């Protein structure tokens, strides 16, 4: 059983209950971009499960293109790796979730101007394209999450959070300048951390645990105006693990296709060697697995919204 979240946290969430709901359209292709926070969303999948449960007949396509250590101005890839714009066109992206600011925050106040400029340029570039062939993508800029104070042997969380606060504010400013939706996870998560003493949400002060992903998925749903139930918060393990496992399997197939362990044999200088001869065909087979997994998700009975977070 999961522990109750405090009443104070409920009150803090109350301000979000009037948030304008994010537009989710039938058949939307949703792509998640960003750093380790983004990449790890596929491990537990609570937010994606929520989307399918909230819009059970929309046949949503979700692709996690998060890459650990990515920064808005620096996304290091193997030689020959496809350009981001080409990938987004292949996925016909309608809605983008951008998760940046945490890694950049280590530059402190001196790096703020550079971050804001690069973020603005990135948003402008994305808004100038129509990956779906019809319109510019809708964009949600997601703030970094705070450090969690869990161990005296880890870096000072207060100092780190002062930096992250600067970059969260900077992200919000740039989002407003470009007419992009901003989702603040920093403030409510910091509030949660200060009011929960018996349940940690990260494994190391930075990366979310399964419980943390479960809790943050609720923050995201409320912050996007997609979940307005303020009567109570769930306290139990989710009932329908079968669907969440299916989401994980689809994401695993995609991740091993898109981000293979040794991409040099696919995109780089070794893609003509004997060992790489059959990889192109195997990748096509993997794409078929991704599509089949997605069709299976669409056909499955979706968990009720109360079951996504295990309310009892």
Where are these regions (language model features)?
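Conserved catalytic region of serine esterases and O-acyltransferases that act on ester linkages
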Residues: 42, 200-312
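Solvent-exposed loop/turn segments at secondary-structure junctions
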Residues: 36-40, 67-73, 95, 102-107, ...
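Serine-esterase "nucleophile elbow" of acetyl-processing enzymes
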Residues: 8, 18-68, 84-92, 96, ...
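Extracellular serine-dependent O-acyl
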Residues: 135-144, 162-199, 214-237
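Active-site segments of SGNH/GDSL-like serine hydrolases
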Residues: 99-105, 126-164, 186, 195
């Amino acid at each position: 059983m999961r522990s109750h979240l405090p009443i104070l946290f409920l009150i803090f969430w109350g301000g979000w209950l009037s948030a304008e709901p994010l537009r989710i359209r039938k058949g939307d292709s949703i792509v998640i971009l960003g750093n380790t926070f983004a990449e790890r969303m596929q491990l537990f999948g609570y937010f994606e499960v929520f989307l399918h449960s909230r819009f059970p007949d929309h046949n949503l396509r979700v692709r996690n293109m998060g890459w650990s250590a990515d920064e808005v101005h620096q996304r290091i890839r193997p030689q020959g790796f496809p350009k981001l714009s080409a990938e987004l066109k292949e996925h016909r992206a309608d809605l983008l979730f951008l998760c940046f600011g945490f890694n950049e925050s280590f530059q402190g106040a001196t790096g703020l101007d550079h971050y804001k400029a690069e973020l603005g340029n990135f948003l402008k570039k994305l808004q100038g394209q129509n990956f779906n062939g019809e319109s510019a993508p809708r964009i949600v800029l997601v703030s970094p999450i705070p450090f969690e104070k869990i161990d005296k042997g880890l870096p000072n969380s207060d100092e780190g959070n002062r930096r992250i606060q600067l970059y969260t504010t900077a992200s919000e400013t740039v989002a407003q300048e470009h007419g992009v939706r901003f989702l603040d996870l920093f403030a409510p998560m910091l509030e949660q951390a200060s009011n929960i003493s018996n349940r940690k949400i990260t494994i190391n002060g930075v990366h979310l645990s399964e419980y943390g992903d479960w809790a943050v998925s609720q923050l995201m749903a409320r912050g996007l105006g997609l979940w307005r139930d303020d009567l109570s918060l769930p306290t139990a393990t989710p009932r329908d693990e079968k669907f969440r496992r299916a989401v994980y399997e689809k994401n695993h197939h995609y991740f091993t296709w898109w981000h293979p362990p040794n991409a040099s044999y696919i995109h780089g200088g070794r893609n003509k060697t004997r060992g790489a001869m059959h990889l192109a065909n195997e990748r096509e087979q993997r794409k078929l697995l991704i599509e089949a997994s997605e069709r299976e998700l669409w056909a499955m009975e979706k968990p009720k919204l109360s079951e996504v977070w295990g309310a009892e």
